[in-house]
C-alpha cells in the first residue's frame, strides 16, 4: 500500500550511474543504511544490462531493499516488474498506458512522469499513486530531458490538485531542495546526488532533514 512519505528521499539508480570504483550494490546499501525511503531501478543507456543479467541484478537489489523495508520500484520495464513481483513501477509519457499497467499491478505502487501542464491535461491519473515532476533544474543524468520547469511547476500542480502526491526530479542536490519543499513537494528523487556522493550517509541525512519537520 502506498504511503506518500515513501517519496521523501527517493533514490533512482542503474549500473551506469555509479562511479567506477563502486558497485551499484555498495551504493544502494549505503543509501539504504542512511535512510532512503524508496528505490527505483532504472537501467538505461548504451551499457545497460539486458535479459538475464538485468533480471539477476534486479533480484539482488530488490532483496537488499527488502532487508531495509524499502519498496523496490522498476522503471518502465513492465515484464521485469511482473517477473520479480516488484513493489511498483514508474512509467513516463512515452511508455505503456497507465490504465493497462494498472490491470497487472492492482496492489502495487504506480508512478507517472509529468513535465508540464499539457502533459498533465492529457494524463489519466485515476490509477496513479504519485507523479514525478521535472526536470526541476538542469540535469546531467537524462540526456533526453525536457527544459527545466522549476519548483513553480510543483506549486501549480498542488494548487490544481492538492491531494496528488508529487515527487520532484531533475538536477536536485542538497543546496537547492528548499524551494522544492516550499512549493509543496512530498519528496525529492535523485540519481547522481546520491550515487556519486563522497559521503552518502551525510547526503541522505541532509535530504531527510527537509522532510522531518
Swiss-Prot record:
Pathway: Cofactor biosynthesis; thiamine diphosphate biosynthesis; thiamine phosphate from 4-amino-2-methyl-5-diphosphomethylpyrimidine and 4-methyl-5-(2-phosphoethyl)-thiazole: step 1/1. It catalyses: 2-[(2R,5Z)-2-carboxy-4-methylthiazol-5(2H)-ylidene]ethyl phosphate + 4-amino-2-methyl-5-(diphosphooxymethyl)pyrimidine + 2 H(+) = thiamine phosphate + CO2 + diphosphate; 2-(2-carboxy-4-methylthiazol-5-yl)ethyl phosphate + 4-amino-2-methyl-5-(diphosphooxymethyl)pyrimidine + 2 H(+) = thiamine phosphate + CO2 + diphosphate; 4-methyl-5-(2-phosphooxyethyl)-thiazole + 4-amino-2-methyl-5-(diphosphooxymethyl)pyrimidine + H(+) = thiamine phosphate + diphosphate. GO terms for cellular component: cytoplasm. Its EC number is 2.5.1.3. 2-[(2R,5Z)-2-carboxy-4-methylthiazol-5(2H)-ylidene]ethyl phosphate binds at residues 139-141, 171, 191-192. GO terms for biological process: thiamine biosynthetic process; thiamine diphosphate biosynthetic process. Binds 1 Mg(2+) ion per subunit. It comes from the Bacteria. Its cofactor is Mg(2+). This is Thiamine-phosphate synthase. It comes from Staphylococcus aureus (strain MRSA252).
Amino acid at each position: 500500500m502506498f504511503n506518500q512519505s515513501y517519496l521523501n528521499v527517493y533514490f533512482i539508480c542503474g549500473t551506469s550511474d555509479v562511479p567506477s570504483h563502486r558497485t551499484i550494490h555498495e551504493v544502494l546499501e549505503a543509501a539504504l543504511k542512511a535512510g532512503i525511503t524508496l528505490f527505483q531501478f532504472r537501467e538505461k543507456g548504451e551499457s545497460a544490462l539486458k535479459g538475464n543479467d538485468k533480471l539477476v541484478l534486479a533480484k539482488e537489489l530488490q532483496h537488499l531493499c527488502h532487508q531495509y523495508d524499502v519498496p523496490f520500484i522498476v522503471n518502465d520495464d513492465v515484464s521485469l516488474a511482473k517477473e520479480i513481483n516488484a513493489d511498483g513501477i514508474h512509467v513516463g509519457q512515452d511508455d505503456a498506458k497507465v490504465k493497462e499497467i494498472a490491470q497487472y499491478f492492482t496492489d502495487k505502487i504506480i508512478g507517472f512522469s509529468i513535465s508540464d501542464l499539457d502533459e498533465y491535461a492529457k494524463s489519466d491519473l485515476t490509477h496513479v499513486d504519485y507523479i514525478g515532476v521535472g526536470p526541476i533544474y538542469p540535469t546531467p543524468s537524462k540526456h533526453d530531458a525536457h527544459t527545466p520547469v522549476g519548483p513553480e511547476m510543483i506549486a501549480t500542480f498542488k494548487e490544481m490538485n492538492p491531494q496528488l502526491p508529487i515527487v520532484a526530479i531533475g538536477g536536485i542536490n542538497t543546496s537547492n531542495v528548499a524551494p522544492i519543499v516550499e512549493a509543496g513537494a512530498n519528496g525529492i528523487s535523485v540519481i547522481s546526488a546520491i550515487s556519486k556522493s563522497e559521503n552518502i550517509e551525510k547526503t541522505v541525512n541532509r535530504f531527510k532533514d527537509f522532510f522531518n519537520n
